[in-house]
């Protein structure tokens, strides 16, 4: 029943008569949800009174105008003007139009604050980006917004609350507020400069490396900024070490100048792309969780916001990328066997078997059928289906999974595991696997996980590894969240902004998606679909998992893709590694995961 003391507007009539003209550019689902919302309110407005916008509208509009500070675009939200006539109040039609359009703008902001600009990353960008924004249903969003005492505060609450999102946001604000004096100034060619010398470039190098000018006593001579002192020398050596510049000494060289002239500062687009990814992350990462950041090639165990363990990892090749997703680790397996994936059976082993060879010999592989050992020479491979044979590598020093693996069941069938190919961890770009993540010191990771989950000691872990049973599955008492991420920009606790290479091209795809340049995005082929030319459909254990195939999955009637070229220098890095690797380690690249 309408309240005689409240304002009611003919909003239903406005929706029925004006949608095709004045509301056609707004999201249809937003319009439909808003019409039902106002119908339930009998046309009672939120934002206007008889004289114009009320205080709730003022709070909402003020916050929406700050959208750029949150990684959104303020110009995308069309805030309707509501000018008061010279005499009297605005008419009902003007009030109704302002009310509805402001609500629609607020709904758009609310959706996009939660990540709706790219609402299906796995289909819009790449099937490897298995993330989905945590959107709020439109009716719930409207109810919460209308009930919130502070409308601006409610809009702010919709953004990610992760500390890293806020750190990136502050970097974005600072970047946009930088003055002309902060422009990147290149260091020209010059002579070698050693410690103790004076040269005008020293002051420029000092600023680039953020080394402060020494403070002198009041009665001492003013310090010459061109003097090459010990503090700067230490920073130069650290920079050379970090950037692989040889020899590592304090001498200023052309190689050092060239490295210092690389403007590695991320642009706004890179910051925005990383902020957007945080909108896709779970709101609760877990009190203790594992994070594998692909561009950084690093796995971390994080407890109560602090890193308690960190280690290097090897990730998937460009052609067999490690997917980006979250799931729950449930099992740690000590002394695991490796079950050869069906794709490798058919594409790698079967041709050699049919040619009369024995590709299992020398690689530590064994074969069974129906639980019984089988000799490859006793099988007519022209007639038999190799998929009916269990080909595996028993536990041992040469096993491609090493001595431990960490399972978090997922549709991509990837996991963390050990590897005998330890030399790969010395590479700077470590994209060498079939999709799984190899850990440099997996026993230490197991020790941390088991200490947190079961209170086990290092001695207990060593006992399991040394004398425990093979394929020893140890279920975790409490499943542990695992977040595989793709952050190319990260702000450290000290405020330092670190950047990492866009090894799979996802950062570029996100940039283009945020700018609406969808036709410029080159997608990866959907790695979960059967390959076009393979003899069989790709099954779940194609990645090396032993869990059996997934339910059948049909190919969409219309599916097209363009193969994307790998990032610059990717082929050279792969070729460089293969030239210097041994034959056995190279075979681990073919048969390992």
Predicted regions mapped to residue ranges:
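Cationic-aromatic interfacial patches
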Residues: 1-134
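Well-ordered beta-sheet/strand-loop patches within structured domains
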Residues: 1-28, 100, 104-108, 127-132, ...
């Amino acid at each position: 029943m309408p309240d005689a003391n409240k304002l009611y507007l003919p909003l239903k009539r406005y929706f029925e008569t004006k949608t095709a003209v004045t509301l056609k550019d707004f999201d249809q689902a937003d319009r439909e949800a808003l019409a039902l919302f106002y119908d339930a309110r009998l046309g009672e407005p939120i934002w206007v009174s008889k004289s114009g916008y009320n205080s709730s509208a003022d709070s909402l509009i003020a916050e929406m105008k700050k959208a750029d500070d949150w990684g959104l675009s303020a110009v995308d939200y069309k805030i309707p003007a509501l000018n008061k006539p010279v005499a009297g109040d605005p008419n009902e039609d003007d009030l109704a139009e302002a009310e509805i359009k402001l609500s629609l703008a607020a709904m758009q902001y609310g959706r996009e604050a939660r990540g709706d600009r790219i609402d299906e990353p796995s289909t819009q960008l790449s099937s490897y980006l298995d993330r989905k924004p945590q959107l709020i249903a439109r009716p719930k969003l409207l109810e919460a917004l209308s009930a919130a005492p502070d409308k601006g505060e409610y809009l702010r609450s919709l953004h990610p609350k992760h500390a890293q999102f806020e750190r990136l946001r502050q970097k974005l604000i600072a970047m946009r507020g930088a003055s002309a004096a902060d422009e990147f100034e290149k260091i020209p060619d010059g002579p070698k400069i050693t410690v103790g010398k004076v040269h005008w470039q020293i002051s420029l190098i000092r600023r680039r490396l953020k080394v402060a000018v020494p403070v002198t006593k009041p009665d001492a001579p003013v310090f010459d900024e061109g003097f090459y002192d010990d503090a700067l020398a230490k920073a130069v050596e650290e920079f050379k070490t970090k950037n692989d510049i040889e020899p590592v000494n304090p001498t200023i060289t052309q190689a050092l100048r060239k490295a210092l002239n690389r403007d590695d500062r991320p642009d706004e687009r890179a910051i925005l792309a990383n902020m957007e990814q945080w909108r896709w992350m779970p709101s609760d990462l877990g009190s203790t969780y594992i994070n594998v950041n692909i561009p950084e090639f690093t796995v971390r165990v994080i407890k109560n916001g602090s890193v308690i363990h960190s280690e290097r990892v090897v990730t998937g090749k460009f052609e067999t990328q490690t997917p980006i997703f979250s799931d729950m680790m449930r099992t740690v397996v000590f002394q695991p066997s490796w079950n050869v994936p069906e794709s490798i059976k058919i594409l790698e082993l079967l041709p050699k078997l049919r040619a009369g060879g024995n590709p299992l010999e020398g690689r530590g592989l064994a074969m069974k059928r129906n639980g019984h050992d089988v000799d490859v020479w006793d099988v007519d491979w022209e007639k038999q289906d190799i998929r009916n044979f269990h080909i595996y590598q028993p536990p041992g020093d040469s096993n491609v999974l090493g001595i431990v693996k960490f399972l978090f069941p997922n549709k991509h069938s990837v996991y963390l595991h050990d590897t005998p190919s330890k030399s790969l961890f010395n590479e700077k770009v470590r994209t060498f696997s079939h999709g799984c993540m190899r850990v440099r010191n997996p026993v230490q990771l197991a020790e941390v996980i088991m200490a947190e989950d079961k209170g086990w000691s290092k001695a207990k872990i060593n006992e399991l590894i040394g004398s425990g049973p093979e394929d020893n599955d140890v279920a975790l008492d409490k499943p542990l969240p695992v977040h595989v991420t793709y952050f190319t920009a990260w702000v450290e606790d000290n405020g330092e902004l670190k950047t990492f290479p866009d090894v799979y091209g996802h950062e570029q795809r996100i940039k283009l998606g945020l700018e609406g340049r969808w036709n410029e995005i080159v997608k990866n082929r959907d790695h979960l679909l059967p390959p076009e030319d393979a003899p069989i459909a790709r099954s779940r254990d194609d990645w090396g998992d032993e869990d059996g195939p997934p339910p059948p999955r049909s190919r969409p009637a219309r599916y097209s893709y363009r193969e994307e070229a790998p990032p610059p220098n990717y082929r050279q890095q792969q070729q460089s590694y293969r030239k210097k690797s041994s034959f056995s380690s190279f075979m681990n690249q073919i048969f390992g995961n």
